[in-house]
Amino acid sequence: MGRTLAEKVWDAHVVRRADGEPDLLYIDLHLVHEVTSPQAFEALRLAGRPVRRPELTLATEDHNVPTTDTLAPIADPISAAQVEALRKNCAEFGVRLYPMNDPGQGIVHVVGPQLGLSQPGMTIVCGDSHTSTHGAFGALAFGIGTSQVEHVLATQTLPQRRPKTMAITVAGDLPVGVSAKDLILAIIARIGTGGGAGHVIEYRGAAIRALSMEGRMTVCNMSIEAGARAGMIAPDDVTFEYLAGRPRVATGAAWEEAVAYWRTLASDSDAVFDREVVIDAASLTPYVTWGTNPGQAAPLGSLVPAPADYPDAAARASVERALTYMGLTPGTPLSDVTVDTVFIGSCTNGRLSDLRAAADVLRGRRVSEGVRVLIVPGSMAVKAQAEAEGLDEVFRAAGAQWRSAGCSMCLGMNPDTLRPGERSASTSNRNFEGRQGPGGRTHLVSPAVAAATAVTGRLTAPADL
């Protein structure tokens, strides 16, 4: 019987297999940031162990860093302590670190791909759930906990139980104006936040193949919001063109050899998935979340749902709680919902193509009065590229704030937060209660929808401007 892409990568990395025990996997790349690593390094220190493969480990400061005055000391003492601990630990254990103000600094899931570290057929881990981003390259990439971070630092291996596999085929072509973010929100709305639990999702079909690498990263990034262990897309010429010439990618004969191997990384025609889902791309429109989990999403042209629309008692209770928290009334057009803040950035949508999409909407327009707009590049390299193209001038002319790189308003762990009761249109990946600050209300959208919303002050598709 044939094997799926996930099974091929998994099998190639099994160091030890025994009945009744998890497989022991070799890890090709370990990404590290300041929040989930301090205890892991301290455990190594107490045990007198080195980092096993420091050359396969890369660290960056992203979660806690400010995006305005990056030369001043970090004001929050806990955040400052975590950043300082990462610097100390990387220096002591010989791990390459990209600190604040370094040209290479940025969100860990933006930095890895832009350096060419994320490659097809690899196993990639990080103490961060959105490690699934790197699956866009045909890598098996997943988040791990702090104790597992220690295990990988010490051994470059990780015990893991073999996951199930799921195929999500997006048939046909996406309509004009529908982005990768709209697609993944629609997928999560369809299968639910637990729909991928215990599975590695492989995204397939014409619509997936038509996506750029950055669009593919957006889709794989939010696999975890569907409950999946990881998300993957088989590598193809789009992948190879993206990787060619990047700093950490082979050249010459070694490159040709790598590409030849990467071309074998596709699910066999007779591979059997544990679950299969088909999505009709042509039926999709811009999507937005209305509730407090990413599965509570709907087309932007629809109405706020009512609890009575749901047959299950638990679902009705969840919807009622979400509407209460979000301050929404059933039957309200989603396009009538006003916002206080727009955030464009994050490891989901903080890449150059995302900023270009936002700039295309904002060019020649002004931000609605009273709306705060934060545009935060995913890395300092993305920031430099955007400025070279003049995108920062477009944003400033529109009345938006152009920031330095970091996780920013994706999560309430740095100065960029919502105040209680404030409502945002956000290109990030989670809309949980308090995710962007205590009492903050978050609507997940694409960069283009976020930019259009900034112009009108209410949830808006660019086509409606």
Swiss-Prot record:
Keywords: 4Fe-4S, Amino-acid biosynthesis, Branched-chain amino acid biosynthesis, Iron, Iron-sulfur, Leucine biosynthesis, Lyase, Metal-binding. InterPro entries: 3-IsopropMal_deHydase_lsu (IPR004430), Acnase/IPM_dHydase_lsu_aba_1/3 (IPR015931), Acoase/IPM_deHydtase_lsu_aba (IPR001030), Aconitase_4Fe-4S_BS (IPR018136), Aconitase_4Fe-4S_dom (IPR036008), IPM_dehydratase_rel_enz (IPR050067), IPMI_cat (IPR033941). Residues 416-443 are annotated as: Disordered. The keyword Nucleotide-binding does not apply. GO terms for molecular function: 3-isopropylmalate dehydratase activity; 4 iron, 4 sulfur cluster binding; metal ion binding. Its EC number is 4.2.1.33. GO terms for biological process: L-leucine biosynthetic process. It catalyses: (2R,3S)-3-isopropylmalate = (2S)-2-isopropylmalate. Pathway: Amino-acid biosynthesis; L-leucine biosynthesis; L-leucine from 3-methyl-2-oxobutanoate: step 2/4. It is an enzyme of class 4 (lyase). Binds 1 [4Fe-4S] cluster per subunit. [4Fe-4S] cluster binds at C347, C407, C410. Transmembrane segments: none annotated. SUPFAM superfamilies: Aconitase iron-sulfur domain. Its cofactor is [4Fe-4S] cluster. PANTHER family: 3-ISOPROPYLMALATE DEHYDRATASE, HOMOACONITASE, MITOCHONDRIAL-RELATED. Catalyzes the isomerization between 2-isopropylmalate and 3-isopropylmalate, via the formation of 2-isopropylmaleate. Belongs to the aconitase/IPM isomerase family. LeuC type 1 subfamily. Heterodimer of LeuC and LeuD. This is 3-isopropylmalate dehydratase large subunit.
